[in-house]
């Protein structure tokens, strides 16, 4: 039985997700369809990549993931299928794959499958769903399109380092209004080398000078910074909504300033 997931920035008020599911179920009535989320911020491939990165390994081998964020195709950003870790990812090659996995992929192909309509505004329904059905029915990737040797890099969304400063952005705000940044533990340790630091939010308006292991390491309503199981720097208010109270949005700048050695 095929397992097919959907990740999109459509929200839940419109018909888009239902239309895609209908196309799939009309051909695979026994398929298991999983909504990972439809609440990705519009066009945020960094957020979509973060969500998928932290859940796809929990799915069984052979799972097919449809990613409907920034799906417009171009010569630079073609539609592709990528096989990695025994699973299949159908998306536009817009840099998202470098956010999902950073240890390579098994195979990638261009999608050379004709749509059943003359419209090009809903490729997730008219193309991605069709490809998902083909894969679920056992079609080899070579039947879908020619091999793609390399994938586009989403490095524009990686944290940058200059002198003693790591500058990142907020890539996800969770249901508790906690901020997840694109600053990894690895980069933090490499640059910091154990030095004291100041985490700056909204310039010098809010600062944090230590890492915690738990939200409850600080008093209620106090700010806390930690590295969660996802491996990224997370900033929160204990038992409060940081993003709302501090006026933080996706792509807001976060700095980690290390003291001079």
Describe the predicted segments one by one.
Residues 86-91, 95-98, 104-114, 173, ...:
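Conserved subregion of the PPM/PP2C metallophosphatase catalytic domain
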Residues 6, 33-36, 67, 89-92, ...:
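General beta-strand structural signal in soluble alpha/beta enzymes
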Residues 15, 19, 28, 43, ...:
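Conserved active-site and cofactor/substrate-binding residues in soluble primary-metabolism enzymes
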Residues 180-247:
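A conserved acidic, glycine/proline-rich C-terminal tail/linker
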Residues 27, 47, 60-62, 66-69, ...:
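Active-site histidine-anchored catalytic micro-motif
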Residues 1-76:
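N-terminal glycine-/serine-/threonine-rich phosphate-binding loop
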Residues 117-184, 189-192:
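Anionic-ligand-binding alpha/beta catalytic cores of soluble enzymes and soluble regulatory domains
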């Amino acid at each position: 039985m095929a397992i097919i997931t959907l990740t999109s920035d459509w929200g839940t008020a419109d018909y888009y997700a239902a239309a895609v599911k209908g196309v799939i179920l009309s051909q695979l009535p026994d398929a298991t369809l999983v909504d990972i989320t439809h609440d990705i911020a519009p066009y945020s491939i960094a957020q979509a990549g973060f969500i998928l990165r932290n859940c796809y390994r929990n799915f069984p081998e052979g799972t097919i993931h449809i990613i409907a964020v920034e799906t417009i195709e171009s010569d630079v950003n073609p539609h592709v299928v990528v096989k990695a870790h025994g699973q299949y990812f159908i998306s536009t090659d817009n840099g998202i794959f470098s956010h999902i996995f950073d240890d390579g992929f098994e195979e990638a192909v261009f999608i050379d499958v004709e749509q059943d309509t003359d419209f090009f505004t809903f490729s997730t329904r008219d193309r991605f769903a069709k490809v998902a059905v083909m894969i679920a029915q056992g079609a080899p990737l070579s039947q879908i399109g020619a091999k793609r040797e390399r994938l586009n890099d989403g490095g524009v969304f990686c944290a940058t380092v200059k002198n003693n400063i790591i500058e990142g952005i907020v890539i996800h705000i969770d249901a508790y209004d906690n901020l997840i940044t694109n600053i990894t533990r690895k980069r933090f340790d490499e640059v910091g080398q154990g030095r004291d630091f100041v985490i700056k939010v909204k310039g010098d308006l809010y600062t944090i000078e230590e890492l915690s292991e738990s939200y409850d390491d600080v008093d209620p309503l106090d700010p806390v910074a930690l590295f969660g199981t996802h491996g990224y720097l997370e900033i929160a208010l204990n038992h409060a909504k940081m993003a709302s109270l501090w006026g933080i949005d996706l792509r807001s700048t976060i700095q980690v300033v290390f003291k001079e050695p």
